[in-house]
Amino acid sequence: MALILTIAMSAVLLTAFIIAVYWRNVECVGEIPTSFLTFMAILFTSGLDVGLIMFPIPDFNIYANEASYAFTNPLALEFGFWGFLVWGFYFTTIFYFCIVEPKLKLFEIPLIKWTNNIVIIGTCAFSAYLFLVYLPDFIVAISDPLKYGLVGTVVLIAAASSTHIRYVKILSIGSTWLFFGLIFGMWWSGDMGLGGLASSMMNIGDYFYNINHYLAPITDYHQFYLYWWFAWSIMIGQFISRFVSGLKAWQLLGALLVVPSIPIAIWFSVLYFYFDNGMDIASIWRIAMVGVGVIFVINSLDSLMRLYTRNIGMTVERLGRLKYVASNWLIMVSLVLLYQFTPLQIEW
């Protein structure tokens, strides 16, 4: 499987390069064109999930203690799992769904259509499940009723927000600014100054020096990430392609590789400063991380709910607002509980 994944990853990235070179001046225009900044905000908040907030600290511990990762530092590894190269996946799928799919209509073939929708629904629920699993790491001694109640509330808000397209812009832009605020707050609280932040960020340079290592699974955990990026890029590519507003192919690729990677690099560098210096994250900032994580989960679930409900005709216009929200909430919560309490488990 690792060989197949390596070949697939290389093929996707090579395709991205070919598109950016040979079809570099093809303009990508979606159904609902938005400004560049709004497009990037929607991409950033829908294309990522709660893992961006909750995974880095536990991941740093893993990378620092396992021999398989000894070729570089934990910050470079975490950036390699989330930044730069992997965004080429999104470029390929956004270009496909914006330019190619309207002509080929492969995703309207019944088998492909229903397989696609099943994967979207399962992944949507798994995102909520990951939030459930990682909550105790950030809210110490959280009770089970509160934990499940919070996840159920998040799913309910996501279902409600997916009823109208205007909420996409509000959620995306708002959560982007909240994320920037979280970065600033934790930077300020850590008393690292610009020098400490810059020193921490220097570790990311090792990612580019060892970039060849990320073209194949390093470990089973890295393999999980790559599978996740592949699945996520196909789903989010369908959604995000609706909001592109006339970017040429080469501009789109450049924007995807660079723009999201900047805040990701700064965020990870702030967290790595805490980790590398043995600093505890204060309770108030852990709560803030959960708060921003909640918004990211809502964004992710919102975008995926919009996608599968549109694909299968389970729309607000057809069902009515109340039945639409209730149906989506019931589907998601049932699957989250299925992941939690039955042998239906995903290992990562």
Set out the residue ranges of the language-model regions:
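Loop-to-transmembrane helix boundary motifs in multi-pass membrane proteins
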Residues: 146-152, 223-231, 250-282, 286-291, ...
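Transmembrane alpha-helical segments of multi-pass small-molecule transport proteins
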Residues: 5-14, 83-91, 112-125, 139-164, ...
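Membrane-water interface regions at transmembrane-helix termini and the short interhelical loops
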Residues: 1, 16-32, 73-75, 94-109, ...
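Hydrophobic alpha-helical segments and their helix-loop junctions in multi-pass secondary transporters
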Residues: 12-22, 51, 123-140, 146-147, ...
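Membrane-interface loop-to-helix entry segments
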Residues: 106-122, 162-186, 257, 346-348
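Hydrophobic transmembrane alpha-helices that form the core helical bundles
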Residues: 49-69, 83-104, 110-140, 201, ...
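Helix-loop-helix connectors at the membrane interface of multi-pass transporters/channels
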Residues: 113-116, 127-148, 239-262, 304-329
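N-terminal alpha-helical transmembrane segments of multi-pass membrane transport
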Residues: 1-69
